[in-house]
């Protein structure tokens, strides 16, 4: 049976068996890592994946509101509304949320990476980050012209808001962010650090406390 804590669409998930005085207990690997306050966002940002991340963060806050949550991101991005539910939860809960890019953090994934607690935003050395303007999904968009205009105006407002927040978290000027997100803008881990998307590039666990 698939665990509710398990990232979606990953196929076979390893199990971990722990021994205790009460016998053996088996966990899927993601549930076991959740005990260490590690939350994964793997794959596209969807309503389903966002709901799992939000639920895990709220659970970890209830377990210990004063201990950091470690949020690992390997995502090409996805839904803005789903991503913003994660973003608002990160700000709402009491624990600091340390973010770590493993593989890639693109689009909404990059936004969530930058939104971690300042001083606690990391990327592994061969990961990559990509920022761009919001996308309108659904090439077959149809409907009344007036409704399409309404959606277009809303997307312009969303773009402005996302640029403001990215400027806030990166420390870049709004004008710089507006220019840099006009097209896909890829960064290496070190370039992401220089831009202000993260605070440190990690090559080993020792680098976290160095």
Swiss-Prot record:
InterPro entries: ClpP (IPR001907), ClpP/crotonase-like_dom_sf (IPR029045), ClpP/TepA (IPR023562), ClpP_His_AS (IPR033135), ClpP_Ser_AS (IPR018215). Its main location: cytoplasm. Fourteen ClpP subunits assemble into 2 heptameric rings which stack back to back to give a disk-like structure with a central cavity, resembling the structure of eukaryotic proteasomes. One of its GO terms (cellular component) is cytoplasm. GO terms for biological process: protein quality control for misfolded or incompletely synthesized proteins. It comes from Chromobacterium violaceum (strain ATCC 12472 / DSM 30191 / JCM 1249 / CCUG 213 / NBRC 12614 / NCIMB 9131 / NCTC 9757 / MK). It is found in: Cytoplasm. The gene is clpP. The active site is at residues 107, 132. It catalyses: Hydrolysis of proteins to small peptides in the presence of ATP and magnesium. alpha-casein is the usual test substrate. In the absence of ATP, only oligopeptides shorter than five residues are hydrolyzed (such as succinyl-Leu-Tyr-|-NHMec, and Leu-Tyr-Leu-|-Tyr-Trp, in which cleavage of the -Tyr-|-Leu- and -Tyr-|-Trp bonds also occurs). Its EC number is 3.4.21.92. CDD domains: S14_ClpP_2 (cd07017). The lineage of its organism: Bacteria, Pseudomonadati, Pseudomonadota, Betaproteobacteria, Neisseriales. Belongs to the peptidase S14 family. SUPFAM superfamilies: ClpP/crotonase (SSF52096). This is ATP-dependent Clp protease proteolytic subunit.
